[in-house]
């Protein structure tokens, strides 16, 4: 694709590379000590009595969040127009209706 514009580029530095190598060498790819450590540190960062759960993707995170707030079939969920398709797809998966709204041209809010 000649004119491809990336949605977002990840910032991957030496620290991130070292952590991935450490995880691979530990034998744990998904669950395990690094995931538990992340969940605990994120909960501590939030500073409230919260529980954090690491998931495999943003789509899974959106699914859990919508389930947690009680979205059910027939509900309407506002989603931004400038987003990844999974934002609206997970709403449909739950039987709800995505309502796509545009963003402010200056602030993108």
Predicted regions span which residues?
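Conserved PLP-binding active-site segment in aminotransferase class I/II-type PLP enzymes
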Residues: 1-68, 72, 93-94
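PLP-dependent aminotransferase-like
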Residues: 67, 71-109
